[in-house]
Design a protein with these regions (language model features):
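Boundary-proximal intrinsically disordered activation/regulatory segments immediately upstream
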Residues: 1-65
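RNA substrate-binding interface of SAM-dependent RNA methyltransferases
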Residues: 2-3, 48, 100-109
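Short secondary-structure boundary/capping segments
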Residues: 26-27, 34, 69-70, 88-91, ...
Length: 109
């Protein structure tokens, strides 16, 4: 069973700041070795390929409705206040959930 979800309500939270960089700055993915994938369709695709995300991130309203479906998907679940999730998303219409996956290491020559 995964640990309880971590709830974040402040934009000053360091994890929120890190997630926002990852979601909005393409260079951050390369620097951090992780990628932000937004939307339940991408989370379902990861699950179908047996990819276990490092983080699953939910808007609070989404978590209240779908925690039972997603609770075991990632190693850690993060629940953001709805306005924070909207600020995190680079999409015009935020999907209300996303995942962070570890990127494979580049092949060595």
């Amino acid at each position: 069973m995964p640990p309880p979800a971590q709830h974040i309500h402040s934009p000053a939270n360091p994890l929120f700041k890190d997630l926002r960089r990852l979601a909005q700055d393409s260079a951050a993915s390369r620097k951090q070795g992780r990628a932000w994938l937004e939307g339940d369709h991408l989370a379902r695709a990861a699950r179908a390929r047996q990819v276990r995300p490092a983080l699953a991130v939910f808007a609070e309203s989404s978590w209240q409705q779908s925690a039972h479906e997603w609770a075991g998907l990632a190693r850690q679940n993060i629940v953001l206040a709805d306005p924070l999730f909207a600020a995190l998303s680079a999409l015009p219409s935020p999907a209300r959930m996303g995942i962070v996956i570890e990127l494979p290491l580049p092949a060595q020559p």
